[in-house]
Amino acid sequence: FKSFSDGSLGSRSAKLYTDYADDPGNTGILVISPEDLAKRMYKAYRHGLQPATHCIGDKALEVTLDAVEYCLQQGLKDGMTPEEQAKRLPFRIIHAQMATPELIERMKKLPIVLDIQPTFLMTDLHWIEERVGKERAVLSYPWKTYLDAGLIMAGGSDAPVESFNPWIGIYATVTRQDMDGYPVGGYHPNEKVSVYDAVCMYSKNVAYANGDQDLMGTIEAGKFADMVVIDRDIFHIPENDIKDIQVLNTYMAGIERYHRD
């Protein structure tokens, strides 16, 4: 059940704590009041739906976490047991592009999954510092920091806004570069994610986000045999080549559904 808390960095409508560096006086917008967002999310949560909230700016993230906490507290007041709450699908925070250390500490205590779109960075890295300032740019797209904090990230594309090609998404996660390999070494390379963790983001973590971790996401006995065969070993090629990976075969439930000629 999707909601929107704010806009985007490109349009300067993502809600920030302070002014945009290139637009003094503008902190972006909340597209829904904090109170209404919390009530909307709780209505979905109470009826067994999975709340998923678009959230890009740091202030929008704070408002969204407030709403998650409200849902959990209100659920207890309405008779839900902690055990019942633990069985619910995790709250999904879509994008989570900016986060302060304080917000990350709050997220560590909540049943959430971060829906990350790494390909956003391939475009944004060219102007993000000008848009939000160097200090906040350091706090943007902090994937390794999220990982080190124990947060679960599920990789996505936001297609058709960006390419749906997962190999490009994994490439962006691992290199933090655009398609031309800019910047050399990657944008804030301390936030790079390993190839293994990036693959997990696009497989097992997505299954977890959907509540399907017992059915898919890893190749194990008893799970659906949904898998692909690719033309090179992603763990033993130069990182720059990841974006060029091609699928040779696609299997669903163990049946070949695609074969590349």
Regions found by a protein language model. Name each.
Residues 42-52, 59-91, 96, 101-105, ...:
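His/Asp/Glu-enriched, well-ordered alpha-helical/loop segment
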Residues 1-50, 78-79, 104:
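Active-site-adjacent helix-turn-beta-strand microarchitecture at beta-sheet edges
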Residues 260-261:
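Extracellular/periplasmic ectodomains of large secreted or surface enzymes and adhesion receptors
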